[in-house]
């Protein structure tokens, strides 16, 4: 059995913490031979964990790609706006790519990357890890088996969780769409992908409403300050207090471990005192929506209502799939799927085992599938290939376009046509390839 050799571009939370445990557990399947990471602490931590030598370490992806081809594939886990250039350069150099979602925050770049992967005959797989979880696999199986007849409508709720929202989308890296992507893409492209996968048809119309309503300077309480540590008069009662949130035990609050490296108590306090995670949630440079709804119609007549909210107790996804012969209700947090059959009145509740791997088994699942696809030379139309993912990305871009235009209905056929590659993919080159 051939051992697949990988290089990792971006050794942060996803590149290191999410995907490397699989590599460490299955060294005969996959081996990491290099890492490119600008942060020295992260680079050295990665090297120690994966037993890499100094010759296998690179500060930038450009430095790595200037070398002769070293391995089979790259795992690219940079920030959203830094996906396009390394991906195109890697594909052009003959590498297969596993790319963290979203593909890009620019729809033209998404279209071009998919076209280049096809032209080069390379596998470009997108990290839509939810498709690989036992929960969503079971949901898809029940629908495909006809358990509820023909699907008519779907209600899909993404409950972001009030603390997760404040951490990632008010104070964190995804707070501003000029730094990352719109919320519907940065957070909800998983959901757009799942919806497209479950419906199994192209989307024809999209309409969306939403806004940044609460986390704004005009809603800052009287007596609040720029930072939670500046003598804020309401810090002790504020649900978003950085001191209360980030100084908790990191074993019970995983977000607290993300603001400092290593996440010692002293380092976390320094991060609160001087970094973005200590800012008042009403006084940051955030601009992404805190709630949004999307209505969709598909070619097969299915209608979908999607809701994303940052104002929920739990981080959860709740889905209701309504068919001609029954109904399915799924609760991701409890990992239960409730099937009701109209003809018999029978209700069947299935408890889905929860994997210890990240994203309820999805992180391991996508690594396993990517390695298998490479070993068996499956490069086109895989479960989360760029070909499969592009449609859901365009749905997200269309939803944002609608939201910014007062909920105007977007015709998806015309929308897709507007993002055809501006030039032939074969003419798209980067300096790194010259």
Question: For each of these PLM feature ranges, what is it?
Answer:
Residues 12-15, 130-279, 406:
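Predominantly a Rossmann-like dinucleotide-binding segment in NAD(P)-dependent oxidoreductases
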Residues 77-78, 158:
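Glycine-rich, N-terminal phosphate-binding loop of Rossmann-like dinucleotide-binding domains
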Residues 50, 288-434:
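C-terminal helical cap and adjacent loop that interface with cofactors, partners, or active-site loops
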Residues 67-68, 73, 79-80, 84-131, ...:
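Beta-strand-loop-alpha-helix segment that lines the small-molecule cofactor/substrate pocket
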Residues 260-310:
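Alpha/beta-hydrolase fold catalytic core
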Residues 54-60:
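Conserved SAM-binding strand-loop segment of SAM-dependent methyltransferases
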Residues 1-52, 434:
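N-terminal Rossmann-like dinucleotide-binding module
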Residues 33, 55, 72, 152:
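Conserved acidic residues
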């Amino acid at each position: 059995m051939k051992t697949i050799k990988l290089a990792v571009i971006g050794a942060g939370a996803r590149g290191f913490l999410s995907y490397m445990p699989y590599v460490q557990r299955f060294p005969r399947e996959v081996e990491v031979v290099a890492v490119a990471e600008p942060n020295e602490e992260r680079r050295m931590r990665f090297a120690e964990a994966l037993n890499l030598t100094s010759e296998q370490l690179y500060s930038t992806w450009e430095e790595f790609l200037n070398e002769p081809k070293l391995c089979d594939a790259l795992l690219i886990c940079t920030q959203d706006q830094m996906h396009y250039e390394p991906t195109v350069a890697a594909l052009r150099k003959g590498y297969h790519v596993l790319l963290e979602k979203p593909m890009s925050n620019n729809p033209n770049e998404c279209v071009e990357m998919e076209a280049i992967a096809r032209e080069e005959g390379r596998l470009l797989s997108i990290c839509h890890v939810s498709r690989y979880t036992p929960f969503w696999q079971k949901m898809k199986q029940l629908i495909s088996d006809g358990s509820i007849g023909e699907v008519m409508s779907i209600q899909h709720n993404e409950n972001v969780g009030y603390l997760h929202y404040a951490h990632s989308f008010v104070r964190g890296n995804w707070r501003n769409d000029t730094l990352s992507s719109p919320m519907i893409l940065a957070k909800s492209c998983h959901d757009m992908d799942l919806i497209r996968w479950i419906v199994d048809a192209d989307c024809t119309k999209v309409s969306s409403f939403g806004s940044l309503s609460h986390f704004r300077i005009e809603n800052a309480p009287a007596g609040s300050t720029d930072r939670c540590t500046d003598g804020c008069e309401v810090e002790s009662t504020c649900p978003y207090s950085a001191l209360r949130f980030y100084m908790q035990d990191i074993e019970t609050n995983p977000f607290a471990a993300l603001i400092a490296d290593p996440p010692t108590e002293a380092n976390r306090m320094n991060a609160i005192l001087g970094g973005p995670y200590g800012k008042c949630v009403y006084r940051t440079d955030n601009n992404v929506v805190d709630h949004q709804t999307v209505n969709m119609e598909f070619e097969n007549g299915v209608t979908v209502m999607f809701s994303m909210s940052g104002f929920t107790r739990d981080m959860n996804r709740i889905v209701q799939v309504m068919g001609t012969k029954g109904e399915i209700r799924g609760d991701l947090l409890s990992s239960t799927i409730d099937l009701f059959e109209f003809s018999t009145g029978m209700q069947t509740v299935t408890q889905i085992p929860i994997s210890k791997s990240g994203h309820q088994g999805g992180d391991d699942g996508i690594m396993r599938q990517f390695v298998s696809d490479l070993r068996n030379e499956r490069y086109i139309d895989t479960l989360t290939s760029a070909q499969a993912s592009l449609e859901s990305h365009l749905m997200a871009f269309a939803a944002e376009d609608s939201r910014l235009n007062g909920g105007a209905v977007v015709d998806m056929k015309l929308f897709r046509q507007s993002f055809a590659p501006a030039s032939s993919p074969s003419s798209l080159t980067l300096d790194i390839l010259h």
